[in-house]
Amino acid sequence: MGLQLGAIVSALGGELHGDPALSIERLAPLQNAQPDALSFLSHPKYQQELAASKAACVIVAPAMREAAASRGAFIVAADPYLYFARLTQLWKAHHARPEADRIHPSAVIHPEAVVDATARIGALCVVERGARIGAGTVLKSRVTISEDCVVGERCLLHPGVVIGADGFGLAPHEGAWVKIEQLGAVRIGNDVEIGANTCIDRGALDDTVIEDGVKLDNLIQIGHNVRVGKHTAMAGCVGVAGSATIGAHCTFGGGAIVLGHLTVADGVHVSAATVVTRSIRKAGQYTGMFPIDDNANWEKNAATLKQLHSLRERLKALEKAPQKK
């Protein structure tokens, strides 16, 4: 069940050059697109792929208008990648299958939980006492929302997400550990997406807070009492330790780590595999990974790095020494 180009432009805008009645049967990347597909060009460096592509139509920026015109139908959009993102939403809605039961029969929902009439609860989900699920929110299979935790409106939680497990709180005593009961909850804002098997721990006393528009990838760990600001995005395997505060509009590459009790300002972008060991007070891009190398060179560089302080002191001493004439 395809979509005509005219219908796409009518719904999303853009400047169409080509037959509005042309039907698109699939969306595909430039290099793999067939004559019934629509694709997009997000960066001029892929212009060679544009010329070679078999796609029926391509979304391009204004600067690529001439290159696109030489190969067939195209749609001009100020931001082709954003246009394509909205197109995927239109495409999914157009091809949506009939909805099954709003609440799957295998889901377990406590009588004292509050689930909005428009929310959807998937197979084997658990919603515990006092939890609240907002309008239009979707819980995929095997999601757990623990006691008193709140999920806002229009959220999407993928399979295996756990909201409100106990935070990691322990007090040492005579060589053993005494559990600190986690008495807070988790509060998730509106329009939040949480990837598969991500865990967000409940607070020890205050709540763990995920603000509106946050996007979390798969396999992320958010510790107790963390606060994540609006529209921050984190890629897979990020870990945020307890009581860290993350600002708004930040991004974290895959495998990045934030140590506990630190503050990260708004607009900070942390590269993949970076370990944040101190608070970041100023917006910008931050990277803290050790460059990859063949093992022999890596070991030599690592050994040198261990001596960096002593080498610095020797250099300072040499700089202070009287110069021979």
Curated annotation (Swiss-Prot):
PANTHER family assigned: UDP-3-O-ACYLGLUCOSAMINE N-ACYLTRANSFERASE, UDP-3-O-ACYLGLUCOSAMINE N-ACYLTRANSFERASE 1, MITOCHONDRIAL-RELATED
Gene (name only): lpxD
UniProt protein name: UDP-3-O-acylglucosamine N-acyltransferase
Protein family membership: Belongs to the transferase hexapeptide repeat family. LpxD subfamily.
Pathway the protein contributes to: Bacterial outer membrane biogenesis; LPS lipid A biosynthesis
Keywords: Acyltransferase, Lipid A biosynthesis, Lipid biosynthesis, Lipid metabolism, Repeat, Transferase
Native source organism of the sequence: Variovorax paradoxus (strain S110)
Biological classification of the source: Bacteria, Pseudomonadati, Pseudomonadota, Betaproteobacteria, Burkholderiales
InterPro entries: Hexapep, Hexapep_transf_CS, LpxD, Trimer_LpxA-like_sf, UDP_GlcNAc_AcTrfase_non-rep
Disulfide bridge partners, by residue number: none
GO cellular component, one term: membrane
Gene Ontology BP, a term: lipid A biosynthetic process
Pfam families recorded: Hexapep, LpxD
Subunit structure: Homotrimer.
Molecular function as annotated in GO: N-acyltransferase activity
Transmembrane segments: none
Keyword Disulfide bond among record annotations: no
EC number per UniProt: 2.3.1.191
